[in-house]
């Protein structure tokens, strides 16, 4: 196992440059601010959203900025078959032996895809209680984290990683828009709405990559994990949700279309949300309204949505983008007397989304658009 650990941690043997990593300052800062807390930090989010890259960017900061000794940092990917017969405690013990580190010496542990480990929550509790370690862990499954995190109550925080926003997209594309070229903002922004914010897809533009990602989530993370007998039904459900992204999703209507029971439709919808393929937005109101009223459905990534529905209804795509920008403000939608307002944030800010043809001349001014897109 020693050889495997050295392969995952090249900074143990040489000065590592981390040259291939593209910076993501905003989500990285959200992760960094927990660096000196005692909490275990969980990174969650859609498959291939960049959780591994963010863990490695933090490792880079620890070595280059915080001056942490490289041997005090250990990264492992727990979906590696070669590590499948070892539990986390055994791996960490082996790591400490390699570098002659006692349990009292502080180390930084980066445990990628932690949910591949059976009883991971008990092992993390043991590490938390008995060793001096700062622990960062990642998972692409909200359902696994929700069912097992009670063991870690009071010991952990969860940070959801979202796709690249417009400014990050421009960085990944190596595009800088000067004031003189601000008229190009619209063009690049519409390209962004088509492409979405999955880092690897932004860099490569390979449609098969997106299709493979969706199939992996549907058939591995949902069908196989939940032992669903009709895989095609889940693919049909996915396509239906993509068509209805940005709209209020009536469970009864969905159930009728798919010819399944409403309870089954509701349960399957929650499975999609737990894999971060879709986000659900509740209606504003008293608790009974929030629970019982149908939810609005938004795609987790604009590129995935465009792939399966085409580049049409740009206003709806823009609304989806705005939702992703304000998701951290826990928005709900307002529906009163037949009228709807797109979002009411936790800070009591009402947001009605409009795009171009719906906007006034002043709102269409490029400087206004740039401020909005910088968000």
Placement of each model-derived feature along the sequence:
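Conserved glycine(s) of the Walker
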Residues: 50
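Hydrophobic anchor at the beta1->P-loop junction of P-loop NTPases
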Residues: 43
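Short glycine-rich substrate-engagement loop in P-loop NTPases that contacts/grips substrate
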Residues: 74-104
């Amino acid at each position: 196992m020693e050889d495997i650990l050295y392969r995952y941690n090249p900074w143990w043997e040489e000065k590592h440059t981390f040259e291939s990593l593209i910076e993501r300052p905003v989500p990285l800062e959200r992760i960094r601010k927990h660096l000196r807390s005692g909490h275990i930090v969980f990174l969650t989010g859609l498959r291939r959203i960049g959780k591994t890259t963010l863990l490695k960017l933090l490792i880079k900061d620890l070595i280059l900025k915080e001056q942490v000794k490289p041997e005090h940092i250990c990264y492992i990917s727990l979906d590696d078959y070669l590590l499948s017969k070892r539990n986390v405690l055994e791996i960490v013990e082996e790591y400490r032996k390699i570098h002659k580190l006692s349990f009292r010496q502080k180390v930084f542990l980066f445990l990628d895809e932690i949910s591949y480990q059976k009883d991971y929550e008990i092992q993390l509790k043991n590490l938390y209680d008995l060793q001096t370690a700062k622990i960062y862990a990642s998972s692409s499954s909200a359902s696994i984290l929700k069912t097992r995190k009670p063991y870690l109550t009071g010991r952990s925080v969860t940070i959801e990683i979202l796709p690249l926003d417009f400014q990050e997209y421009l960085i990944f594309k190596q595009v800088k828009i000067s004031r003189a070229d601000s008229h190009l903002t619209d063009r690049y922004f519409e390209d962004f709405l088509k492409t979405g914010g999955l880092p690897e897809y932004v860099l490569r533009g390979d449609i098969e990559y997106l299709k493979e990602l969706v199939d992996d989530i549907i058939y591995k993370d949902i069908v196989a994990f939940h032992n669903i007998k009709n895989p095609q039904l889940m693919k049909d459900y996915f396509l239906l949700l993509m068509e209805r992204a940005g709209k209020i999703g009536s469970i009864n209507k969905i159930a009728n279309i798919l010819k399944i029971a409403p309870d089954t439709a509701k349960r399957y919808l929650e499975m999609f949300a737990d894999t971060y393929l879709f986000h659900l937005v509740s209606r504003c109101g008293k608790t009974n309204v929030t629970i019982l009223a149908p939810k609005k459905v938004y795609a987790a990534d604009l590129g995935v949505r465009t792939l399966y529905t085409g580049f049409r209804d740009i206003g709806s795509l823009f609304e989806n983008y705005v939702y992703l920008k304000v998701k951290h403000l826990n928005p709900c939608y307002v529906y009163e007397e037949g009228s709807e307002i797109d979002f009411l944030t936790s800070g009591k800010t009402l947001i009605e989304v409009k795009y171009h043809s719906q906007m006034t001349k002043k709102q269409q001014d490029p400087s206004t658009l740039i401020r909005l897109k910088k968000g």
